[in-house]
Amino acid sequence: MKNSKPKVKEKKEENIIKFDYMKTNKDNIINVIKFPIHINTINDIVVKVNKIVIHTYQFLKLYLIHLYNNNKVFPQINITFIEYIFIVLTKRKCNSGGYTEKTMPIQLKELTNFYNEYYKPLIISDDIIYYDKLNYVLDYEAIDIEKNINVNISEHFIKHLYKYINITLEAKEKRDQITKDYKDLKVRKEKHIELTQEIKKVKKDLTNFNELESDKKYHKWILEQRKLIYGNKIKFEENNIAYDLKAHPQEYLKSLFYICGELEKVYNQIKKHNENIKEEDDGEKKKKKIRLFNVIPLRNNIIGKNISLDSRTLLTNFLDKSLKTIEKEKKQIEEITDNKIKIKNSQKYKNADIKCNVHNIDIYNYKQGNNQKLLWDYFFRTNKRVFKKNKYRFNNMIKTDGVSVSILFVRIDDKGIPVKKQKGKKYKEQTDCEYIEKAKLTDELKKMKIVTIDPNDGGDLIYCGSKDEEGDLETFRYTQNQRRLETRTKKYMKITEKVNNETKINNQTIKQIESTLSILNSKTVNYEEFKKYVLEKNKVNKILYAHYQQEFFRKFKLNRFINMQKSEAKMIENFKDKFGTPDKIIIVFGDHDKGSHNMRGLEPSICKKFRRIFKNAGYKVFLINEFRTSKLCNCCHQELDKFLTRASSKPRDKKKNKKTLVNGLLKHTVSNPEGELNQIPLCTIIHNRDKNAVQNMLYIVEHIKKTGSRPEAYTRKELDLQTNSSPCKTLINNC
């Protein structure tokens, strides 16, 4: 049997340069700007750009739905196309340099016609934004929008496709029916595995164009879906859908519209079904709603976001010099210098002797000599420590939302010259860790103390364990609640909620105004429904823009970042005190984040960030495959089960007094008079899941140190290797 997923080509080490090409330092903008009056200018730009970007995403999605419904070809969503949308959505006080009816590109004409006919009626009349002096800032926004759309497609397409398959084939309903029909646990487990493998083969057939391997009853449906999802595509580049998604993400845009449309039909059926069921009706249960997704990401939060400011933006917005003034100054200088300056088509100064005065710098000569340094020195306190970084140099660019500022640095060589980016090379600091199962453990490493870490989604973010000199277990925890408290996330959320509940506009609180959007669906791909959403969203935004422009919303974001750095630094110091310095221990991290999942209702797991924190602190960090580390007892290495039930904390379950199994406590639930199962003695310990996991990891690492392989109980069998669809590639075959 072949593997269920095609192998992904390993990245060649020679194509990866192991340092970050750019880095940032973050601070409050008040600490770095010289003239506070310019903060008002920045805030004004932030507000305008935020409005333009919000409208751009909405306009783009509406336009694509229109094209999809009319079976028209989708445009290539690139920087030029996005900048055309900016032009369509905004006005200019100065029309010089704009397009005429004759010179206007065809694509821009089509967008203008769509705007006038369909989108303009959805905009509040006095919400039109002026484009003047924003072109350099919007250039960077166009880059970000294109990147966001491409990443959204390439990262999430397979997940959405798998969800569509599960819902269409009613995988959950079939699984529940098996649970209901088979009381014998062993038989039930076998039936569940059979169903899982059956659905996996369907997923495999829908992610390649090879011969069908699934059950024949699915073949007709699969062939139909291949045509509907992929259109005329008959193969993937490198015969791999993951590779093809990265190489040509926008070829899958229509596919996502189709998938979302089909899921929306199911969503509407469930909604209608639930609306027809009365609360007191015990005969028929309400169906669980499915979650839709946004094909095109929208900016629903209207709090000001970061914008990019470079030297050109400073010149056009801070010096307040119009192009006409620049042209006059150029002519005067040309006359004075007796033709030493040659100007051709208003392009650049050549061989000009310009005084070292910032007001003589313009968009034509800002790159000459020391001009950029003069410019930034004039407006910002560039002598401060925040503008310095070892092996890096300030790149004459910042990102700011009017409260925080991120200062961008570029890598320099030994001579202090910025490193030129090499085509085809990927720059990233080495955060990927080697698996302990594959690592070459030297005698020096074997003598070092081992600390294993089990990362989690909620509760304990990391649970660490190690053996002391007497062989007793030492533990260390860094919890979600500790992080929330130290970053003051919960405090800021409560303050924000209180303000939104107490502030009134037109006799309505902020919460009440926002609640009008709850009956509408921003994720819909139905043209009329999305139009209703855009119209209502624009009305709500118009009312709430002034409220969300208040500084404390952005200040809380900066405070959380600063507090998080302090919390993580404190965690590292406590870890050192508990286990020792980097020269004495090695860390083995569970590979929990190697999937694309995230548990609903919990904050995303941040395992990669934690590994980077420990590596930056100087520790040697390895990964370990977590297979069965929570499932098996660390004493007898037999399976554990959940046993304790308690009242569910979910609001919908509280009314029914529903009980759930506690996930964090495990024990052996099978027992017999001799206390043995299959001649293997069972222990009677009640295990904490995380504590059990780190002890199992310690056992596995010690076994690897002695034998070079994992213990058999923690090794995937041949069948597991063939059918496993986990993204983790480090599977040990020891059979």
Give the location of each predicted region.
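Positively charged, helix-rich recognition surfaces that bind polyanionic ligands
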Residues: 2-289, 293-735
